[in-house]
Amino acid sequence: MAAEVLLSSLLGLLFLGLLLPARLTGGVGSLNLEELSEMRYGIQILPLPVMGGQSQASDVVVVSSKYKQRYECRLPAGAIHFQREREEETPAYQGPGIPELLSPMRDAPCLLKTKDWWTYEFCYGRHIQQYHMEDSEIKGDVLYLGHYQSSFNWDDETAKASKQHRLKRYHSQTYGNGSKCDLNGKPREAEVRFLCDEGAGISGDYIDRVDEPVSCSYVLTIRTSRLCPHPLLRPPASAAPQAILCHPALQPDEYMAYLQRQAESKQHEEKTTEEVQDTDRQVWSGSKAAGAPPKKEDVSPAKEEKESELWKLQGPEEQAAAREEAQAGEQDLNHEAAADPAPSPPNDFQNNVQVKLIRSPADLIRLIEELKAAEKGKPSVRREQPGDDTTEAPQREAEGTKAKGKDGEPPGLMEEEDGDDEEEEEEEEEDEEEQQLLGEFEKELEGMLLPSNRERLRSEVKAGMERELENIIQETEKELDPEGLRKESEREQAILALTSTLDKLIKRLQENQSPELVQKYKKRRVVPQKPPPSPHPTEEEPEHRVRVRVTKLRPGGPNRDLTVLEMNRENPQLKQIEGLVTEVLEREGLTAEGKIEIKIVRPGAEGKEEDTRWLTDEDTRNLKEIFFNILVQGAEEANKERQRQSELESNYRRVWGSPGGEDTGDLDEFDF
């Protein structure tokens, strides 16, 4: 892969840079093996170019991509001066020793591993055998690769000085005096290395690999969770990768042309912004002019003065100051309002204006629901006749009481009721039109929202509720005493419990909204409820709940075709991965729906499937966190990582200063 080739060349130049300056100055150069084993690097291809040849710093390396684009890459400070703070003394550990931690393996069943023709059997503290099996029976001779002889002594001064076991973080045993070797006539011997593997607590101890570096001399690697409590054998915390920043290096004329394009683009952007602002001002001034209330021709000047004074009362203080004048002219205003009702004041119009900012489809759906709820209450509100003052209603009621006829109805309001009926009919017609428009808009919106968009909206709502729950938890922690939720574990348990409850509530909401989706969801559900205990339990039930398929792509052949290798179902590492996924699903209350694909890109190793480890120790340790991020935290982080990878690919394919202008590489090539 192109990115890996670029990173490998960078590291090669880095190591040469560590050696060459020392030789030129007469010093002694050395290659830090600890740096190679424990330091990680990550390359970042940036879109911002620089003028080539201007930097003469020792931490800048010039490389070229496969598209012949030159880059100036700045190495991190840790690559030049590797300083790691670590305690050379043994950490304070009061638990059992390494032999005591491994002693339960003596009573456990022997471990088996089949590789090609041979099957290897390891019995802790006793022997290692090699034989061929057919139909679960041993065929032919049984060869002993060695009998137990000794175990590594961590307290020995010579062992402390070597630091081999401490750096590699493994415990070893020596097995010797095995069967006679036909090639050299010496007895066979073997070294057994025990490594901590926290995932082995689910799948059990297993033989990871069997190597034969020298004829009839073997190395067995066994992974177990029994050694993980010991600080010397526990894997170190994975540090963040050291970033190697690479900028495209341009020639002086190319760089000046780039600066010219940037200046022109900035000017165009500023001009566009000014035009938009001018347009907004014109629209705003036009809306103000259109919104001005028209003058009435049949209103006297004294009435206009009173109304203008009344409409000028915008703040609460001005309303209180002018309340006496309003009461003084109350009767005149009431008579005039009965003859010619005044329009609603602009102050009320401004107070009734509501601004809705729609940032996502979820906000749009909520706005539609609010409009529906508001439409239901409109007819009853509109039927009430608005008055100019609160005392108007009692006055009209008193007048109506005096003027009641024999039938108990005000005779003077008969004609007004006819007019009200006509207004109500017009309002009902308007409501029906609004409801019809709203229904059509909602249907179009439902047609636009695909099922994937609905799921995304639900995930956004869930993420927002989780953030609110996080805020509630933080406020609770502040209010409680110091002994409340101090422990991080209690806090995590509370968050997980709330998240699980939230997931159940969302499922119930889905069931109430769409019964058809519920039936489809039940059909697609992969994790069934626990069946009643049967007299003959089968071991195939967990495979129906969660199935993990691990494949490997390796270029091979004259045409560099990709060879697809699939991990065997009997591989202990596959069972370990399935156990991790099942554990995350059960703890979070989630269901195994659909398919999740995770790509791990790293330099490939030569050899057959059995000779290479599918996942590194770091991949296995981080796999649980990867599943948690994808299943629990939603697709936000995944989208960010996908966008970052896309930007890296685009920046890598970009070729500056090509004859036809800027160009890009072949989009069909598999780079990352």
UniProtKB/Swiss-Prot annotation:
Residues 414-435, 663-672 have a biased composition (Acidic residues). This is Protein OS-9. Pfam families: PRKCSH. Glycans are attached at residue 177. Residues 263-281, 294-310, 320-338, 372-386, 394-409, 637-652 have a biased composition (Basic and acidic residues). Lectin component of the HRD1 complex, which functions in endoplasmic reticulum (ER) quality control and ER-associated degradation (ERAD). Specifically recognizes and binds improperly folded glycoproteins as well as hyperglycosylated proteins, retain them in the ER, and transfers them to the ubiquitination machinery and promote their degradation. Possible targets include TRPV4 as well as hyperglycosylated HSP90B1. The lineage of its organism: Eukaryota, Metazoa, Chordata, Craniata, Vertebrata. Residues 108-230 form the MRH domain.
